[in-house]
Amino acid sequence: MALKDYALEKEKVKKFLQEFYQDDELGKKQFKYGNQLVRLAHREQVALYVDLDDVAEDDPELVDSICENARRYAKLFADAVQELLPQYKEREVVNKDVLDVYIEHRLMMEQRSRDPGMVRSPQNQYPAELMRRFELYFQGPSSNKPRVIREVRADSVGKLVTVRGIVTRVSEVKPKMVVATYTCDQCGAETYQPIQSPTFMPLIMCPSQECQTNRSGGRLYLQTRGSRFIKFQEMKMQEHSDQVPVGNIPRSITVLVEGENTRIAQPGDHVSVTGIFLPILRTGFRQVVQGLLSETYLEAHRIVKMNKSEDDESGAGELTREELRQIAEEDFYEKLAASIAPEIYGHEDVKKALLLLLVGGVDQSPRGMKIRGNINICLMGDPGVAKSQLLSYIDRLAPRSQYTTGRGSSGVGLTAAVLRDSVSGELTLEGGALVLADQGVCCIDEFDKMAEADRTAIHEVMEQQTISIAKAGILTTLNARCSILAAANPAYGRYNPRRSLEQNIQLPAALLSRFDLLWLIQDRPDRDNDLRLAQHITYVHQHSRQPPSQFEPLDMKLMRRYIAMCREKQPMVPESLADYITAAYVEMRREAWASKDATYTSARTLLAILRLSTALARLRMVDVVEKEDVNEAIRLMEMSKDSLLGDKGQTARTQRPADVIFATVRELVSGGRSVRFSEAEQRCVSRGFTPAQFQAALDEYEELNVWQVNASRTRITFV
């Protein structure tokens, strides 16, 4: 391979920066990098991002050279920009910082006192890093496909690579010294020391000509005002779970972030990082201990937040007309719910509840008191009813989620752990699963197998949406604004209808009341249902997809984008519905007391109805909650309660819905002979019956001459 002429390469770079242009909408030339150089010269911009796709248009060979030897070419580009900046400077910089004033002052003093023929010593020259007031980063070419962390090996050292993963840990942003400036206590000369490695040995003896001649032995003192610092942050990145081969542990990589790239990513973010893969050069005793092995890191040039499993950058984007047509049909609510885990047979109401969990309600913060909008759901049931499959599907569908199991999780693993930082040696916090799932969903399987001490760590998260830490002198509060989806088995493996609810579930009331919906999925023998389920499972097993039907499930990417659009809406509950909701809640409390209901109905139940109602309004992309939303929320609440009552609650509803509707209407009459049609329908719908069932019961009892409905269908009168 022939040696490169880097002087010629620098000229190519200069030519590219000056001459590259793109045509705008009007057909005029827009000098992309020329305009940025003007802003850099006037301190209106700090970072210059060089898109290598632009370089490829001009010189494809130069792109290959940059990708192969990125560190050298980054310096080459920076030098070229530094030389070009004076040409683009049209006026004096207004916003000057301390270092500007310091350098200007030194240059002015030097011009006054210096002999024209005198040459400065190398240590006394201003280093390029001190004079350079901008940052330069490369944006990888589109042909450079993202790689898995475990595929970045020794052959990638020094090259520009793009990797994807999840951020597990982020350090505080601290100042990193780039140039150290010293002043001599004897002769007053200034010495500059550019720093390239993570550690450096400060200079002690003055190297100036005066001190050397006089042998005065002047000592150097660090002058922080004249030194240059840059923002520095360390980040740990781990492979996605789907990138890890079977039986392997997820690999992680250290990413060192500087300047404008800091504070972009948070723990739990899915990111794509373009950077230079380099070894860490240890010095002194550490090198002796380390031997021939070397740790590696990625010097970040560009960090992009990603959606969980999409190739494009984060952000939902507008839906096309065709996509909106797919969603906006008459039964879109049922269609969206059925698109959740279409391979799993049945569980229609459970899927509707999970859809509302993904959309979420609206957060309220009246005078600093926070009322959560996230919906928490617990699925409890017999083994083999697809609870874990539903959880894993939600984990894949949610843009941001964490999946964990009860026995494999400790309280610290869920909340936060105190670790010692490898660089600074300070104690730092590392977020657990609930912190990493902030603004997302945390799925906890085998919830009943968790130790009681670990389960109590979740109480604060489920209501206050925060985690308060008081460990090793660190007192802080972390955000954990996530919905919790838990799956658990009953206490004795299967649900025993002969035992009470408390004996079957064995979870504390404080925890159960924090779940908006607690759903019991039982595996009851039913010939027709079992036959359909068996046919469904065998088809899925043979063809690895759901059986053909008239219904076509929506694509996962489309659902994710639609849910992201729904979450932007902030619907409110109108005053006209306030009385209706309070009346429904009071009725639920009365019924629970009268029937000695095993489930606990508290003020949290009312908040759960409001959350479910606002989630339904979000799903319809409207700004005001309507009566139908409240009715559906109450219906889901009633269905979840009925599932907990087991056979007792199911007999009346499943065998004779008409009889239950008749009893409900008779309750409303209470001494009189007639009742308003709308009032009766509203009460029956709020108890979980559909308008069609109400109509069927009405017709049935009218034929039996038990009651009569007037011609305008506004009143029901008992005969």
Swiss-Prot record:
Its EC number is 3.6.4.12. The modification Phosphoserine is found at S121, S314, S365, S500, S678. Pfam families: HTH_MCM7 (PF24901), MCM (PF00493), MCM_lid (PF17855), MCM_N (PF14551), MCM_OB (PF17207). The modification N-acetylalanine is found at A2. Transmembrane segments: none annotated. ATP 1 binds at Y345, G384, A386, K387, S388, N489. ATP 2 binds at R514, R604. The keyword Magnesium does not apply. There is a cross-link at K15, K28 (Glycyl lysine isopeptide (Lys-Gly) (interchain with G-Cter in SUMO2)). Gene3D superfamilies: 2.20.28.10, mini-chromosome maintenance (MCM) complex, chain A, domain 1 (3.30.1640.10), Nucleic acid-binding proteins (2.40.50.140), P-loop containing nucleotide triphosphate hydrolases (3.40.50.300). This is DNA replication licensing factor MCM7. It comes from Homo sapiens (Human).
